[in-house]
Amino acid sequence: MHYRIGTRGSKLALVQSEYVKRRMEEAYPEDTFELVIIKTTGDKVTDKPLAAIGTKGFFVKEIEEALLSGSIDMAVHSMKDMPAECAAGLTFAKAWKREDCRDVLILKTAGSFSELPSGAVIGTGSLRRACQLAMLRPDIQFTAIRGNVDTRINKLMDDSYGLDGIVLAAAGLNRLGRSSEITEYLDPEVVIPAPAQGVLAIETAEVNTELLDKINALSDDNSDREAVAERTFLRLTGGGCHAPVGAHCVTKDNGDLRMVVLFGNDDCSRILRIEVTGTDSEAVGHEAARMLGLE
């Protein structure tokens, strides 16, 4: 059987899709796989912060349309960029082994976040990241920055942008082989990551059960349970487009789930954080939302 894998054309998207292609080829040598590059609205609109655009779907709309039309068979995304609800007729496969979920800092000269001088400027397009870092250092300024990893690092090094540092996801830098450029890893209990950060989203049509079964056979149980808990919470918050939403779930030694979550308003004047534990992924997500008064 021949399968077409849809992907964005950025360097990171291609690295992730090549990884999925390689694993599928190794597991199913009787099948063939090819990458199909699709340009999305998010690739074209690069001058606005994510919160101002108002939807995560702008990274995936054209790819999901290709899935629904049958011009591709599966698609690979970063799960943290996906809308809280899957498009009608589509579904996500179970999560494969998760990459590092942490946020990281790349600083121009300072050796750590605590060493940044008062008034330093940090670039991030994420309200979640800016809100949490501002709570730790209210004397630091934040400015919106968009673009792929190369673009953001180039802006940091270009003095005309006036940046002292940028915030990125460890997973992307690791996948690109650029982890040596990280200045500091941020504790996920302090700066809570985006829901399902570090997880690859592999999406198919619901009716394509044979392909879905093949993808699911390569899944990682702990990563999948954690991702389901985090994304259940994300869905119950309304999707995380206009408000800071974070979730970090880990599997304890006894198999129970422990999740810390964050939810705030759009100006970061009210930030709530709570911790929940449980055994069922969806129930943990629902309990977190209930404790915050979201359901």
Swiss-Prot record:
Keywords: Porphyrin biosynthesis, Transferase. Disulfide bonds: none annotated. It is an enzyme of class 2 (transferase). Pathway: Porphyrin-containing compound metabolism; protoporphyrin-IX biosynthesis; coproporphyrinogen-III from 5-aminolevulinate: step 2/4. Binds 1 dipyrromethane group covalently. Pfam families: Porphobil_deam, Porphobil_deamC. HAMAP family: Porphobil_deam (MF_00260). The gene is hemC. The keyword Repeat does not apply. GO terms for biological process: protoporphyrinogen IX biosynthetic process. This is Porphobilinogen deaminase. Its cofactor is dipyrromethane.
